[in-house]
């Protein structure tokens, strides 16, 4: 048995890629898209016809140049997501633009539009997760969307305050980041960590512990892995989203995997809900989380801007 096969017995494996060939090869349950992955798709032969067809339709439907670009981003995200749903049994995560991370109402409106586009392609909302940054406004948007039957994936999650706010809001899934947490600590300390001491692994284990101990329904999906050791350190987490390079490492080695995360039982009562003031204070007091959340939003926004420039050039 390969390590990938062994891991799939302990955690649901999600492909952190939009590459159709990689998805076919590794057979994940779920997959994800974001502006960075859509940019990479421009270099993948499997998507060229889809890109050409989508942009031609946008040009035919819309005259205003900026409106064309905005619509092209949405339609392309959904077109790629729709292709991916043909290859997986589960869901595809589709991202709300990072520039909307502090606007609850605009995030909700964008989510509605993405779901509408999926439904026009015959893909029901039960096959889609709307991906939002774990800001206070993003979490509040997700809370409303969940009430409407639109389930969400809260990303760029680096702190216990963010996780608890998501649990309180009843969001479907959160994506606490491993690699970026560890990157920050390595840069600050110059230290190398074993998987057991790895700050990102320790953080996600704590999030899993809270979710399990207090019986929150939210799915925890470890994300942003740098090494195979980090992945193995979270074996047993509800879900793990893994890049093709690390999926290949896991597939190329034989052997069993030890469960590192287990159900820790039932607390007699839940934690008190975290309000906005406590959320913002908790985030403020965590320098790593504050810096990494801001950096992550900027990175996604930069990728979105690059994608928009590329689309504007193609749309003419």
Swiss-Prot record:
InterPro entries: Aldolase_TIM, TAL/FSA, Transaldolase_1, Transaldolase_AS
Pathway(s) it belongs to: Carbohydrate degradation; pentose phosphate pathway; D-glyceraldehyde 3-phosphate and beta-D-fructose 6-phosphate from D-ribose 5-phosphate and D-xylulose 5-phosphate (non-oxidative stage): step 2/3
PROSITE patterns: TRANSALDOLASE_1, TRANSALDOLASE_2
Compartments, as annotated in UniProt: Cytoplasm
Family the entry assigns: Belongs to the transaldolase family. Type 1 subfamily.
The name this protein goes by in its record: Transaldolase
EC number: 2.2.1.2
GO molecular function terms attached to this record: transaldolase activity
Subunit structure: Homodimer.
């Amino acid at each position: 048995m390969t390590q990938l096969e062994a891991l799939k017995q302990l955690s649901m494996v999600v492909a952190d890629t939009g590459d159709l060939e990689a998805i076919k090869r590794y057979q994940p349950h779920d997959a994800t898209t974001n502006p960075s992955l859509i940019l990479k798709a421009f270099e993948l032969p499997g998507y060229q016809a889809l890109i050409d067809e989508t942009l031609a339709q946008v040009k035919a439907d819309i005259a205003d140049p900026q409106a064309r670009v905005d619509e092209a981003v949405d339609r392309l995200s959904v077109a790629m997501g729709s292709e991916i749903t043909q290859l997986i049994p589960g869901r595809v995560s589709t991202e709300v633009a990072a520039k909307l991370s502090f606007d609850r109402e605009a995030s909700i409106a964008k989510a509605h539009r993405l779901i509408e586009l999926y439904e026009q392609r015959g893909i029901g909302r039960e096959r889609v997760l709307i991906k939002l940054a774990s800001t206070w406004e993003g979490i509040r948007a997700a809370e409303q969307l969940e009430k409407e039957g639109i389930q969400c994936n809260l990303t760029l999650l680096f702190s216990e305050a963010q996780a608890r706010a998501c649990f309180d809001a009843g969001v479907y899934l959160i994506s606490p980041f491993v690699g970026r947490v560890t990157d920050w600590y390595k840069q600050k300390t110059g230290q190398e960590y074993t998987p057991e001491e790895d700050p990102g692994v320790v953080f996600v284990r704590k999030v899993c512990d809270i979710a399990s101990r207090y019986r929150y329904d939210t799915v925890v999906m470890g994300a942003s892995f740098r090494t195979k050791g980090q992945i193995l350190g979270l074996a047993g987490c509800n879900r793990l989203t893994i890049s093709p390079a690390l999926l290949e490492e896991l597939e190329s080695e034989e052997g069993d995997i030890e469960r590192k995360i287990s159900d820790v039982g039932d607390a007699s009562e839940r934690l008190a809900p975290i309000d906005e003031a406590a959320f913002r204070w908790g985030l403020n007091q965590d320098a790593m989380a504050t810096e990494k959340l801001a950096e992550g939003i900027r990175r996604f926004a930069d990728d979105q801007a690059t994608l928009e420039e590329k689309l504007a050039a193609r749309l003419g």
